[in-house]
Design a protein with these regions (language model features):
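A short amphipathic alpha-helical interaction element
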Residues: 1-6, 14-22
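Exposed, polar/acidic Ser/Thr-rich sequence context and nearby capping/turn residues
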Residues: 5, 21-194
Length: 194
């Protein structure tokens, strides 16, 4: 055909190149845009948490052998109305005239009596830090109970009186209001009650 690279000629080589670049010529139908949604507003953390001994805290009683989740001290945790409060940890101290070994573990119970997290043993300062977080919704109160577990032999401690005290609360940036320690009623160790 006598045409060498001539300007304006659209031959087989040009058509092949065009087809490779332009594609097969199929038409893509655009998708229908979705309706925008309103973004969720994050819940602000509350500014204050009030802690106080609950009026229905456990009465003085007995603490026998192989007890699990024996209620000692019920604490009301009340969040300010301006936001939810997450309690990151509570520090409990064994007080009273009992030895630490009266307890095989210390635990927090929620309003239904369900154990929150794993029980902890007392350290050399007679304290246990329970760091399973729980939330108190804005403007509400949760009654949480400090409870104790015992082993199967309390013979060496019979007659001793133990109490569990709330001595510290970590509520993050929220101010904790209330007079600490908060102490419940004494429980008398009994080696014949199981």
């Amino acid at each position: 055909n006598g045409v060498s690279p001539a300007a304006g000629y659209f031959g087989t080589i040009s058509r092949a190149k065009y087809s490779a670049v332009a594609g097969s010529g199929s038409v893509t139908t655009p998708t229908t845009p979705t309706t925008p949604t309103t973004p969720t507003t994050p819940v602000a953390a509350g500014s204050g948490l009030t802690v106080a001994l609950a009026g229905d805290t456990a009465a003085a009683g007995l603490f026998g052998e192989s007890f699990a989740s024996r209620p000692f001290t019920k604490i009301n945790f009340t969040a300010s109305a301006d936001g939810d409060i997450t309690v990151k940890s509570v520090t409990i101290e064994r007080t009273g005239q009992a030895q630490d070994s009266v307890f095989s573990g210390i635990i927090v119970l929620d309003e239904t009596g369900t154990r929150i997290g794993t029980s902890k043993t007392l350290n050399s300062n007679h304290q246990a830090v329970l760091n399973e977080p729980f939330t108190v919704k804005a403007g509400t109160t949760r009654g949480m109970t400090l409870a104790g577990d015992s082993d199967n032999n309390q013979d060496a401690y019979a007659g001793q009186i133990a109490t569990l005290s709330l001595i510290a609360v970590d509520a993050g940036s929220a101010t904790v209001n209330g007079t600490l320690p908060i102490v419940g009623n004494g429980m008398t160790v009994n080696s014949t009650l199981a």
